[in-house]
Every structure is written in C-alpha cells, then in structure tokens.
Amino acid sequence: HNIVNPIQTNGLLLDRKWCSFFRENGFLVGISLDGPEDCHDMYRKKTGGQGSFADVMRGMEMLKGEGVEFNVLCAVNDYNSRRPLEVYDFFRSTGARFVQFTPVVERTDPSGGLCAGEGAENARLTPWSVLPDTWGRFLCDIFFRWVRNDVGDFFVNIFDAVLAGYVGREPGNCYFAKKCGHALALEYNGDVYSCDHFVFPEYLLGNIAGDNLRDLRESPAQKTFGEAKTKSLPRTCRQCRYLNICNGECPKNRITPSGEPGRNVNYLCRGYKFFFSRTERYFTFMAGDLSAGRNVLAVKDVKF
C-alpha cells in the first residue's frame, strides 16, 4: 500500500526539527490560517489571549525554508467572510498554492456544548458562524478574481470540487460526495468515530485498542452513516438542478427544516445556489474543455 502522511496544524509549535522531519518523510502540512492578521486573530488566540498570527506566519516561513509542501486551510466565519478579496489576495501573497475554504457552521445546546448536525433540540447557531448569503458572495467574489487571473496557478478546493461535479467525477472532498464515511476520526484515547464532524457519543464506532480499524470502517453502523447522506435528502434537494454538484453538502450543516420530518435542508443552501447560478457558465465552459482534452486556461479570456 502507498502510505501518504498529511498533517494539520495551527503552526504554533513548528520548529526546524519538525520541519526537517516533515521534509525528510514527505509530509504534506496543512496550516490553519484565516486571512490577514486581524481576520486570523479574531478567533485564533493563544491561551494568554494574544493573537496567534505572528507565530503561524513564523511557522509557515520555516516550512518554506525547509522546502516542505504545505497548503492553507481557512475557516470562513462571520468576520473574514465579509472581506473575501482581502483574504484571497493575502493567501496568494504567502506563497501557498492551494487553499481550502471551510464554512463555519456551529450550534450549541443550552449548556453551551457543541451539537451534532440533525436532531439537536433547542440548539442555537453560534454568532461566529458564517451567514448563508455572505458565504455565497464570498465564493463568488473570490471565484471571479481566480478565474480571470489564477486558473492553473492557484488552487481552491471548492472550485475543483464543483468542476468535478460538472464532468461527472468524484470530488476531492467529502462534503460534495454522494456518500459519507470514508474518513474516520481517531481521538487521542483510541476512540474511533464516523467522522470528525460527528465526534459525539451516538457516532462512536469503537476503539483501536480492541477493535480492528478496517472492521470499524466497514461496519454496518458506518455503512448506514455513509448512505444516510443521500437517503435523508429532502424533496427540494432531490429535485434541485445542482444536486449532482453538492449532493446536499455536509450532513453536519443540514439544520434548516424542509417541512419533511428528518429531512433537513442544508443551512448554506441559499448561498451555494447563489454561487452555482452565477458561475455555471464558467464551469460549463471548463468542463467542456476538460472533456475534450483541452487546457482549461482559455476560460481566463472568455466573456459571457
């Protein structure tokens, strides 16, 4: 088997020794970075309350100095979502060539604890969650900057995933895939959960101290979890023209009632539809070029 070693870090504890280890062993390092300094420091603070931006950038420079392959993972929240082009241009300036934008959608129960996606009673959306309309505009603004200037040079995970849907391929992420359950979550104590978005008691599969990891991945409980993504889609999703692109997105975010019991709509649906509708012609053009074996860079000069 070919073993690939990616690691996700906030970058605070990176030093030369770690960076050398990553380089020597071919690690891909994901750095959590939420944009320019004020955007990043809004929510990513150290234990003393200070912002962590300077430390993260120091760690990134060490990775670059050691020749370690890295990419950026950006949590899009209520604050940085209002400044899409500043965020995008900042990432371009860092020397990164790949960025993953992850929308922050979190709910808490009356006690303040985080809730699972569907079925949580009396849950409230956190104030730092991104708004659906803002998420859609965030994606659009960045897309039109990217499609005119950076196609082929800079890679945005969600754009790649959408294009995959247009050409009938599996996306490179789980949340646009038809089924869930391919990536288990392993906790520090050996507990294994169905997904890192569902680290809750009802999604505990077992523990690697006594269970075989392959058996847990192929267990009936995990199979049911994975298939539920499609089986629980409401009618409005099943009839949507963009179903083959987003497949209802992540079940964690399906918290908006659809009128059908147990079949919620994705909280971000309105934002996604806004983005899909305004970029459809561009993705259709790129999909045509890909299917014909042509280079997609021609889309930079297309005018619709």
What are the residue ranges of the model-derived segments?
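Canonical radical SAM enzyme core domain
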Residues: H1-E24, V29, L33-C39, T47-R58, ...
